[in-house]
Amino acid sequence: MADPSSFASPEKFNIKHMHLKLHVDFTSRAIAASTSLTVRSLQDSLASLILDTKDLTIKKVAVNGKDATFALGTTHSFKGTPLEITLPFSLTRGQEVIVEIDSVTSPKSSALQWLNKEQTAGKIHPYLFSQCQATHCRSIIPCQDTPSVKFTYYSQVSVPKELMALMSALRDGELSEQSDSNRKIYRFKQNVPIPSYLIALVVGALEGRKVGPRTTIWTEKELLEPSVYEFAETEKMLKYAEDLAGPYVWGQYDLLILPPSFPYGGMENPCLTFVTPTVLAGDRSLASVIAHEISHSWTGNLVTNETWENFWLNEGHTVYLERRIDGRLYGEEFRQFKALGGWKELQNSVNTFGATNPLTNLVPNLHEVDVDAAFSSVPYEKGFALLFYLEQLLGGPEIFLGFLKSYIQMFAFKSVTTEEWKKFLYSYFKDKVDILDKVDWKGWMHTPGMPPVQPKYDMTLANACITLGQKWVKATESDLGSFSADDVKDLSSHQLIEVLAILLLEKPLPVSHVKRMQEVYNLNDVKNSEIRFRWLRLCIRAGWEDVIPLALAMATEQGRMKFTRPLYRDLYNFEKAREQTVNTFLKNRSFMHPVTEMLVAKDLHISAS
């Protein structure tokens, strides 16, 4: 299956191993890389290789130690520039060669965010982190930047000696750099084959604390205590995940808590999950982000979508496993409650994109579509809804878990397509083919909008949320006195999130209602980011001008796209806030992550910088 998001030709050759030497330079904001690729030919008379690059300067290419000619092709607006290497001799099928490439990144590499010391918690040292998913590894090193190709890697990273480097691999020691006493070299090895999007690097003033037999938490020292508290249950989650999905093959499961500009909730980099500090709620209520990233150790990292059009295979299964872990930790009613909340998230995404937008297909066509622009909760929640629906159809949670375990065993260390997944589903449930044949596969997979069927949910925990939400929707001015702090005193933070999510799917409330809500529930002071985000959106939609500064503060003080993009969009759509919103973005854009900055600029109809 051709990957529309890559120039590389995985049907002609595969990278089997990578040896990286990286030199991180904070002054020039560049990484100089010497990349050694072990390449295996998949055909006879292979005379050239095409690799993905983006904003890279290629200094030199050698094949088996001999200089090789190379040329950069035409640059594509978001795919980057193909690098064509002419081999000094043609390869036969199965033959391997070592391709060495010296390159330097651009300061505007889309995979890297360089933070100056003022943007860190410690305010003393600069900081660098990478985010390669989906198609940004090519802006660090030349590679086959497609999830269909997996390889092992070894790496040596040179950094200023007062800083520490970590990668998505096991640590393999450190040493002083011989040629420069001000620098240090950190070494890493990843012996499990991974796709390029799982290469990850962080460099900063990091400290670590062991919180379990295979988990160390890494962060700046200022965030270490709250992080250690928040993620104390990591080993318990790992054990539940192993019970559900099979043995954990990666050895170490460390967590890195990043500065606030990190664009995602978490990133499942092997051996070292990257986590947003916005989940530091102080009460462990948002730790399910960790259950999600742990689950990726099986669905995503071990069994990988072959192209980004099949992204739901990574995310739908991972959300399914995450909610099974939630069920083990907090009970089946909670799993069902989270599943229902996911359906509302899906409705939100469909409303944002539009119900006829082809990007709301479970399996979208990404030909000439930037994967970052296509990102939404659709692959997560439509994918989960399909699996949850199949669980109910095929005999319940335990029976469906048997399928999931077998699927992971069958496709471990490989990349997989939706067709292969479906074929395996049919072969596993061969005695239930008549049931499977009744599923509207076209409606689920290749049709935009909401799914053709809604699964059934246990409503025990949701009913109180629906009742309170509807009370606010139906309330007239004279009813507002009937609300009090008692309304929410028995609700968990998850239920309060759900009340606000229900209200966000309704018509905007009058300003009088949100003002009263603030009087009785004091939501402006809530620190939980998921509650705060929905509350501020509700107020902006109601047209309450007092919250404009609070919403702008949340949009700029952290950079998690799940929060930043909708807040900026809602503020832009609020006439009275528009000018201030655009000015705030223009003032802050140089401090933003490159992908976040590009997408928010698009949301605000501002041209790229």
UniProtKB/Swiss-Prot annotation:
Annotated site location: Essential for epoxide hydrolase activity, but not for aminopeptidase activity: D372
Entry superkingdom: Eukaryota
Protein name: Leukotriene A-4 hydrolase
Note: In Xenopus laevis, as well as in lower vertebrates species such as fish and insects, tyrosine at position 375 is a phenylalanine, which reduces the sensitivity of X.laevis LTA4H to suicide inactivation.
Catalyzed reactions: Release of the N-terminal residue from a tripeptide
Top EC class, one word: hydrolase
pH dependence: Optimum pH is 8.5 at room temperature (with LTA4 as substrate). Optimum pH is 7.5 at room temperature (with alanine-4-nitroanilide as substrate).
One Pfam family, short name: Peptidase_M1
Residues bound to Zn(2+): H292, H296, E315
Gene Ontology CC terms, in alphabetical order: cytosol; nucleus
